[in-house]
From Swiss-Prot:
It is found in: Cytoplasm. This is Glutathione S-transferase Mu 5. CDD domains: GST_C_Mu, GST_N_Mu. Substrate binds at residue 120. It comes from Rattus norvegicus (Rat). Signal peptide: none annotated. Conjugation of reduced glutathione to a wide number of exogenous and endogenous hydrophobic electrophiles. The lineage of its organism: Eukaryota, Metazoa, Chordata, Craniata, Vertebrata. Expressed in testis and brain. Very low expression in liver, kidney, heart and lung.
Amino acid sequence: MSCSKSMVLGYWDIRGLAHAIRMLLEFTDTSYEEKQYTCGEAPDYDRSQWLDVKFKLDLDFPNLPYLMDGKNKITQSNAILRYIARKHNMCGDTEEEKIRVDIMENQIMDFRMQLVRLCYNSNHESLKPQYLEQLPAQLKQFSLFLGKFTWFAGEKLTFVDFLTYDVLDQNRMFEPKCLDEFPNLKAFMCRFEALEKIAAFLQSDRCFKMPINNKMAKWGNKSIC
């Protein structure tokens, strides 16, 4: 790794909002270490590992994930991604690329949160059919936006590809056939997974494929599907 002083990424010991960040750190050869917090078991789901230090880290808006890079202390997962991406010119070059990045950053997070809300809802099983019914229409929008481009900003890889891969992969795990109607999305997933540093990370013990969510979730809360 290239940097002499490691960044510190703080998050729960799950995939969650940190997967795209971890992949971007790995892809950019950024030296980093993780501070992982563990949520307790049912029924209390004790979060004291994090809550005991939450307001002692000099964070402006204390939350997980956080990234510490020397004097720079950042929360909000997309702000962290942008911070890393700016260091490596991965936010888009042209105005068109930057616009597409801005759109995708927000659109994919809206999409992510729909699945998150479902997974943590106590009525998960009864609400699941409704989610699956509307899923193809949402995926079609992403397919049309990608079109014939290689990446979601165009022909240049940007940080939103890391976000989008993560969210599409979670949906693919939730409904394995959901991408079958969208060859360009499937091709995007294959291209991303074939990036040398991404392929190595996904096969490493540093990668959290599961659990996606924390222990109180109704889906994605265990180490295997």
